[in-house]
UniProtKB/Swiss-Prot annotation:
EC number: 2.1.1.104
Ranges of biased composition (kind: Basic and acidic residues): 7-25
Binding locations of S-adenosyl-L-methionine: T70, E92, G94, V95, S100, D118, A147, D172
Name of this protein: Caffeoyl-CoA O-methyltransferase
Molecular function GO terms recorded: caffeoyl-CoA O-methyltransferase activity; metal ion binding
Keyword check for Transferase: yes
Length: 254
């Protein structure tokens, strides 16, 4: 029996490869399945997300630069990590609206401190009312401006060497190497440094001529260079995780 036009069209469609999600490098989640990422969020993250973090996430979602924010699953991860290592004195470079900062502040004891640095105070002030309402603003020492001069000033005082339990970097990728040179002196032996975006939207494993958003392509080589350098640094143990946009944890051992 001859097939109908409808059947022929159906067979043709079935033979064609299905559209692959996230073909363009630049998607926020590294997971190839949106459904799987949504499952993680709805099953494990959102039900346990503190109300202040949910409120700040909703505020940030309306901001035009919202792609810069820490993902909810990574916020949960940071909060758990700080509790596991009993962090008390920390550094955060790159704040944006403060979602990761709030996750950290909620994890620290009441007398814990976070030295937070960002070049844009206006973005930080979007989330500040939520941070204040959560009762953790007293833990945060916010400095507006480039982080390197602040770190250099800290290093000048020997008392600051090895005085921090944890540092989180989510800022200009072309300066990650410069941040590491300084943080390795400021974080104690046994302390941890977390570098965000080290898988950089998956671009680190993509061909150089793959379709990418301009900002992804611009920073791709900087991220790849940093990843190679940190993998060869004998002063730290490292673990690179595909959480959020990729986070590399460095535990200082010497």
């Amino acid at each position: 029996m001859a097939t109908t036009n409808v059947e022929e069209n159906k067979q043709t469609q079935e033979q064609q490869p299905k559209e692959i999600k996230h073909q363009e490098v630049g998607h926020k989640s590294l997971l190839q399945s949106d459904a799987l990422f949504q499952y993680i969020l709805e099953t494990s993250v959102y039900p346990r997300e503190p109300e202040p973090m949910k409120e700040l996430r909703d505020i940030t979602a309306k901001h035009p630069w919202n792609l810069m924010t820490t993902s909810a699953d990574e916020g949960q991860f940071l909060n758990m990590l700080l509790k596991l290592i009993n962090a008390k004195n920390t550094i955060e470079i790159g704040v944006y609206t403060g979602y990761s900062l709030l996750a950290s502040a909620l994890a620290l004891p009441d007398d814990g401190k976070i030295l937070a640095m960002d070049i844009n105070r206006e973005n930080y002030e979007l989330g500040l009312p939520v941070i204040q309402k959560a009762g953790v603003a007293h833990k945060i020492d916010f400095r507006e401006g480039p982080a390197l001069p602040v770190l250099d000033l800290l290093i000048e005082d020997a008392k600051n060497h090895g005085s921090f339990d944890f540092a989180f970097v989510d800022a200009d990728k072309d300066n990650y190497g410069n941040y590491h040179k300084r943080l390795i002196d400021l974080v104690k032996i046994g302390g941890v440094i977390g570098y965000d975006n080290t898988l950089w939207n998956g671009s680190v494993a993509a061909p150089a001529d793959a379709p990418m958003r301009k900002y992804v392509r611009y920073y791709r080589d900087f991220v790849m260079e940093f990843n190679k350098a940190i993998a060869a640094d004998p002063r730290v143990e490292i673990c690179q995780l595909p959480v959020g946009d990729g986070i590399t944890l460095c535990r200082r051992i010497s």
